[in-house]
Amino acid sequence: MTVAEKLAELGIELPQVPAPAGAYVPALVDGDHVYTSGQLPFVSGELVNPGVLDDSVTVEEGYDAAKLCAINALAAIKSVVGDLERVKQVVKVVGFVASAPGFDQQPRVINGASELLGEVFGERGQHARSAVGVSALPLGTSVEVEVTVRI
């Protein structure tokens, strides 16, 4: 099954990549790797589940936000490589989670991104990962995810 077929089976339609809000690009090809900028959980221009984990956002809502970040990362990758079939391996995922003091469930939140990538790419979706708690993220988002792939 192709990546496009798998996305369709999962009911996922990749969004248009929004124009950057600053002096950066959404994704960059360097040799045989693609690096995404931090992706936020936007759907149709609206930030989903903003706030802080263990305060105004639940682990489940954070998980869903991380999944949306991964979908947006796939859209950014596709925008620079043309076809997600070119992805040979998801190499690394870095997830940032806006966290209340004492919150330690960042890995469960970032599983939303990791599990989606595994579903979409199968074995090629296995990756190294960091899940980091921070006090605040841009625009008040609860989660931000970066993805690196090899093409």
Model region roles, listed by residue range:
Residues 1-151:
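Short, polar/acidic, helix-capping and beta-turn segments at strand->helix junctions
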